């Protein structure tokens, strides 16, 4: 089919009215303002973390460091407990995400089969857990009875599957062509082979999106650590940084420690160190993220 572009004055040319151009300009302006509003807190955190305490105290709006200083990063990176906490968080994130994905993928694939007897009941039970939970105290008792107290596994196993992620992936699997599975089965492939050799490769956007959700949840989790982790050497990064912020505030109240430790630049350096790993990973998964979440949420 041959397509031709219509020049101005020719029949079929789309002429934008003045009202349409005004709307586009206002819309663009609002989007720019929204972007600035969203990015400024992060930019402020970054600028303060690279500023000296004197520079921070001299102004209330921080657009650029007037006096550069990396003492906050030097202090945090020189703390051996930071690296121990980093290692704990990396283990929790990697191991937790692998377990999450294995269980979620298998459960979503099975529940996507309409011919499965009782699949509606199973889906109802899964959705039921989104509205009603066991509560903090019963969950704590279960973790204690299982012998998981003061163990990194207490931050992994209780959250082995997320119902919201299960539903997204289940909807994605349900909309895939059944002919692919039937052809693979006729060629002698097993159900497990169909899942891991056929379905997963073509479900990369949805699977990558779910993996990113799980990884971010594990990386940012500190409530579970507060509940179940007692030893300081087993603290994840988030709990360690939280402790550093509280210790800085306590030092300020008591008048102890050096003036630097009481400053906001050290706190902002701690915050930046916590979000840098996720910032570095997100650009590599961004192209899958939007496609996966929209497709998985709409399909099925």
Language-model features: locations:
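A hydrophobic, multi-pass inner-membrane permease signature
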Residues: 2-300
């Amino acid at each position: 089919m041959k397509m031709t572009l219509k020049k101005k004055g020719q029949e079929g040319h789309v002429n934008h009215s003045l009202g349409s151009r005004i709307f586009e300009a206002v819309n663009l302006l609002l989007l720019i303002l929204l972007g600035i509003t969203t990015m400024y807190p992060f930019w402020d955190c970054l600028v303060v973390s690279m500023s000296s305490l004197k520079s921070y105290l001299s102004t209330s709006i921080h657009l650029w460091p007037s006096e550069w200083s990396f003492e906050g990063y030097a202090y945090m990176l020189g703390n051996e407990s930071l690296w121990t906490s980093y290692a704990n968080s990396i283990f929790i994130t990697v191991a937790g995400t692998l377990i999450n994905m294995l269980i979620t993928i298998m459960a979503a694939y099975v529940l996507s089969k309409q011919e499965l007897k009782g699949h509606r009941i199973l889906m109802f039970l899964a959705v039921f857990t989104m509205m009603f939970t066991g509560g903090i105290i019963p969950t704590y008792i279960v973790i204690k009875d299982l012998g998981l107290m003061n163990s990194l596994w207490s931050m992994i196993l209780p959250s082995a599957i997320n119902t919201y992620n299960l539903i997204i992936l289940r909807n994605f699997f349900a909309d895939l062509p059944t002919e692919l599975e039937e052809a693979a089965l006729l060629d002698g492939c097993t159900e497990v082979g169909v899942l891991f050799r056929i379905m997963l490769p073509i479900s990369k956007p949805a699977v990558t999106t779910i993996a990113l959700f799980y990884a971010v949840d594990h990386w940012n989790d500190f409530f579970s650590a507060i509940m179940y982790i007692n030893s300081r050497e087993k603290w994840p990064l988030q709990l360690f940084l939280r402790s550093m912020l509280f210790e800085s505030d306590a030092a300020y109240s008591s008048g102890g420690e050096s003036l630097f430790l009481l400053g906001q630049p050290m706190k902002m350096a701690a915050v930046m160190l916590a979000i840098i790993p996720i910032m570095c990973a997100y650009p590599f998964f961004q192209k899958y993220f939007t496609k996966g979440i929209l497709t998985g949420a709409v399909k099925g």
